[in-house]
């Protein structure tokens, strides 16, 4: 246990980013969800999967969608020393990315957790396509 006196420092994304600390997101299952969309939702809203607390836990630590996406892409590649091959979509890098059903930069942040992946591309090859119900 970390103790009550340190609880306000847990997942201090905004504070760390504001200090220029290179930090990354990840799925530390079973401690947190393995679902990247849920983890982006947690970082942006500071709410649990049930949407609580309503204002978010330690709201001053909320980060933007862009900052959250970078935690799980560009910054994660940097943390694993693979930024020359991964983390951003650029010529010469691995073409590893997902296509989402919704633009998470434009929807209500509370909708991010339920956003589905329509397609996954690894090394330029489609490895997953969601069947869309008509």
Predicted features and spans:
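Residue-level structural signal for beta-strand termini and adjacent loop
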Residues: 132-133
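His/Asp/Glu-enriched, well-ordered alpha-helical/loop segment
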Residues: 1-110, 115-123
């Amino acid at each position: 246990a970390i103790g009550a006196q340190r609880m306000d420092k847990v997942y201090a994304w905004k504070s760390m980013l504001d200090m220029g600390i290179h930090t990354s997101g990840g799925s530390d299952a079973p401690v947190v969800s393995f679902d990247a969309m849920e983890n982006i939702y947690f970082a942006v809203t500071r709410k649990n999967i049930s949407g609580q607390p309503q204002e978010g836990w330690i709201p001053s630590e909320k980060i933007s969608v862009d900052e959250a996406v970078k935690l799980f892409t560009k910054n994660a590649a940097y943390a694993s020393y693979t930024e020359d091959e991964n983390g951003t979509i650029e010529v010469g890098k691995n073409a590893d990315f997902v296509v989402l059903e919704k633009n998470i930069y434009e929807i209500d942040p509370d909708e991010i957790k339920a956003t589905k992946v329509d397609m996954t591309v690894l090394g330029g090859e489609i490895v997953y396509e969601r069947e869309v119900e008509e």
